[in-house]
Amino acid sequence: MIQYLKCDNGFKETEQYDFSCWINVVNPTKDDINELVSHFNTPDYFYEDISDIDERPRFDRDDGWILTIIRVPNRVRTEDNQDPIYTTIPLGMMLKDNILITVYYGQNNVISNFINWSNQKKN
């Protein structure tokens, strides 16, 4: 799923990209990746690296794009619905000129908490 988040006194989701948007991509499909590669000319292998659950934190450069991968907490429910288990998953941040794209697979509260905090802070 591709989200275009416009920064205007907090973050608001918008239908189309413009240069004031942050692009947040959650569990991208092949169609999502193809759209991002064709529209923004991002290196396609960046998405493969981010999708690797064992990918280590690092940064890379290709064709003007900078990729930074960090690991963020991921809450996983157990089968018996007891206390959740926490693991970490890769979060990729791609940056070129004024374009910021974040990509992750799985459930990530770091991004949603950041958006919610930013929206509450405006008040």
Tell me the role of every PLM-derived stretch:
Residues 1-123:
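Peripheral, non-transmembrane regulatory/ligand-interaction domains of membrane transport proteins
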